[in-house]
Structures are given as C-alpha cells and as structure tokens.
Amino acid sequence: MGSLSSRGKTSSPSPSSSGPDQEPVSMQPERHKVTAVALGSFPAGEQARLSLRLGEPLTIISEDGDWWTVQSEVSGREYHMPSVYVAKVAHGWLYEGLSREKAEELLLLPGNPGGAFLIRESQTRRGCYSLSVRLSRPASWDRIRHYRIQRLDNGWLYISPRLTFPSLHALVEHYSELADGICCPLREPCVLQKLGPLPGKDTPPPVTVPTSSLNWKKLDRSLLFLEAPASGEASLLSEGLRESLSSYISLAEDPLDDA
C-alpha cells in the first residue's frame, strides 16, 4: 500500500536505503529466460502460418546489437529479427521498449477485459513509467487510458502526488484493490496471445457451381414450354428465364403472323 503524505505519514524511505539511481523493478527476473512479446507480424509478406503475430509471447535466445534471436512460445520456431519488433516483459506487466501506440494495440487485442493493464518504461524520461489501462464502456468502444508514473529523487513512485509507493509492485497492488483516481481498478495484466488462429484472411471453401447440361446452340424450342420438373430434379431453365424467353419469342413472331 502506498503512503498518504497528506495525512502526515512518511512518504519516503531514509536516505541510506534509497537514492536517485534506485531501480524499483528489475527487467530480468530470471537469468536463464527472458520473456518478450512480438510487436507486429514478422517477417512481413510471409505466409500467415510462418509469421509472428502481434502479442505473441517469445523467449529471447540471444541479443546481438539491433538483431535478436527469439523463439515463439506458440509455434516453437526461431526468428532472427530486428529488436524494434520485440518488447521485453517482466512480471507479466512491465514492458521495456514499448511505445504508447503499441501498448494500445496490445491491450485492445481479444482476450483483454476491462481493467487489463501494463506498465511501460518511458522512452523519453529516464527512470519514469506509464500505466496503460483498458477501460470498458457498455455504450461505446473500449478505450485505453494512460497515466504517467513519476519518480521522486528518493526513488519512490507516484501517479498522484498525495500517494507514493516504494516500488511498482506496491503501486500495482494498491490500484488493483481500488481505482483511487484512475479510470478503474487494475484487473489483470495484458494477455499474451498464446491461443487462436494466426493472422491472415481466412480462405472460404470454394463454391461448387454445377455445370448445366443445356446446349444453347441445339436448344429445342419445345424445352421452353415444358412444365417445371418434379421436386429434386435439375431444371434446364429457371421459371423466370423460361417466361422471359417465351415473351421475347412471342413478340418477335407476332409481326410475322400478322403479315
């Protein structure tokens, strides 16, 4: 739980226990395995079944400058790809290398309910973060709300100055219990897309069009005036076409009959 400085409670730790360079949360909870998420389809232009998709969970195998080797936790395939297509994920909700726009795309993926959230490291303000939350509205489209998480000189964090926290874990725990000024309580971390079909248009089954046995060049005029076939039998001519052809022939033959 955070501390309420407005109520006279201590809002910061002692100077010896914290400093301006304190890192509230490490991005590497497990040395042997670094979890990440795909930020888009890769490689572009490949068949859907071979491509990564937005939100697909990954394991980072190696990092070589701007090119990383990752393995999909869905298909097991390995990819050597630019790091801009990947964001690291720690604790299920802390993202490194994620923009505001991509945060919105991830949270709006199917499977994320209202209250789904993630925290991303600021790409412009060192040591600061942003909280992104999916807000469900019954009479309208869901939207994403963003809240800047500021950092004090002593390392403590806050969204509202009246309420400070020693760590991101404490902040998440507090706002999971009550909204306390944000759009809604935090419900669960953004869901990684482990299930469901890969992206790409579903190809509908081919439509079978029966081939007509009617030969227009050898059409007998008497066929136009036959009664409709019994139920279940194929018809050479539809009722509408039969009537149209009959009317045309009648009109074409009338002048000859009057001559």
UniProtKB/Swiss-Prot annotation:
Q: Which PROSITE patterns match?
A: SH2, SH3
User: Keyword annotations for this protein?
Assistant: Adaptive immunity, Cell membrane, Cytoplasm, Cytoplasmic vesicle, Endosome, Immunity, Lipoprotein, Membrane, Myristate, Phosphoprotein, SH2 domain, SH3 domain
Q: GO CC terms for this protein?
A: cytoplasmic vesicle; Golgi apparatus; late endosome; nucleoplasm; plasma membrane
* Annotated stretches, region: SLA C-terminal: 190-259
Which compartment or compartments is the protein found in? Answer: Cytoplasm; Cell membrane; Cytoplasmic vesicle; Late endosome
Domain SH2 spans what residues?
93-190
A Pfam family of the record is: SH2
**Superkingdom of the source species:** Eukaryota
Bias (Low complexity) occurs at: 1-20
Phenotype upon changing residue 2 to A? Abolishes localization to membranes
GO molecular function per UniProt: signaling adaptor activity
Where does lipidation (N-myristoyl glycine) occur on this chain?
2
The record's tissue-specificity note reads: Mainly expressed in immune system. Highly expressed in spleen and thymus and expressed at intermediate levels in lung. Not expressed in liver, heart and brain. Isoform 1 is predominant in lung and spleen, while isoform 2 is predominant in thymus.
Quaternary context: Interacts (via its C-terminal domain) with CBL (phosphorylated). Interacts (via SH2 domain) with ZAP70 (phosphorylated) and CD3Z (phosphorylated). Interacts (via SH2 domain) with CSF1R (phosphorylated).
Q: What else is known?
A: PubMed:12024036 confirmed the alternative initiation by mutating the Met in position 1 to Val, and showed that isoform 1 is abolished in favor of isoform 2.
Swiss-Prot/TrEMBL domain comment: The loss of the C-terminal domain partially abolishes the inhibitory function.
Q: What does this protein do?
A: Adapter protein, which negatively regulates T-cell receptor (TCR) signaling. Inhibits T-cell antigen-receptor induced activation of nuclear factor of activated T-cells. May act by linking signaling proteins such as ZAP70 with CBL, leading to a CBL dependent degradation of signaling proteins.
Which named protein is this? Src-like-adapter 2
Q: What organism, scientifically named, is this protein from?
A: Mus musculus (Mouse)
